[in-house]
């Protein structure tokens, strides 16, 4: 039976589900190869866990990620969390886990902060409309 690892990552309203399996080092986000993923900032952010884990680990894996919701940066952060969790679960290596945690804790832990809702009496969550006394 083929070993397949499913992992997930979240950031704001973006949710990413990664499938890690034995392969040739292909990484796809929504069926698009990582090399062709735009914008470049998001591609670089997603490739961080791959660079930290090392080429010897990643070259033997195929990673397919399905990401929904949120914006570009939120999706990129959700994908990198899902990929990092999948690599850690696949390798069962504490040194890789420690390297991820030392680099950025959000590689392993989802960032659950949400946008604060707008309230009445103002243009946003905290600010109020200007008050006039005369």
From Swiss-Prot:
Coiled-coil parts of chain: none
Region (Disordered) location: 114-134
GO CC annotation terms, alphabetical: cytosolic small ribosomal subunit
Family: Belongs to the universal ribosomal protein uS9 family.
UniProt gene name: rps9
Keywords tagged on the record: Ribonucleoprotein, Ribosomal protein
Protein name as catalogued: Small ribosomal subunit protein uS9
A Gene Ontology biological process term: maturation of SSU-rRNA from tricistronic rRNA transcript (SSU-rRNA, 5.8S rRNA, LSU-rRNA)
GO MF: RNA binding; structural constituent of ribosome
Family annotation (Pfam families): Ribosomal_S9
């Amino acid at each position: 039976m083929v070993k397949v690892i499913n992992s997930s990552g979240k950031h704001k309203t973006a949710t990413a589900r990664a499938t890690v399996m034995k392969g040739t080092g292909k990484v796809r986000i929504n069926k698009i190869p990582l090399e062709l993923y735009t914008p470049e900032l998001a591609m670089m952010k997603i490739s961080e866990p791959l660079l930290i884990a090392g080429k010897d680990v990643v070259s033997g894996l195929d990673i397919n990620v399905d990401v929904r919701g949120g914006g570009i940066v939120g999706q990129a952060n959700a994908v990198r969390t899902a990929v990092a969790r999948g690599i850690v679960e696949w390798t069962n290596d504490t040194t890789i886990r420690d390297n991820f945690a030392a680099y950025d804790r959000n590689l392993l832990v989802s960032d659950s902060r949400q946008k604060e809702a707008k309230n009445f009496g103002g243009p946003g969550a905290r600010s109020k409309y200007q008050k006039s006394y005369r």
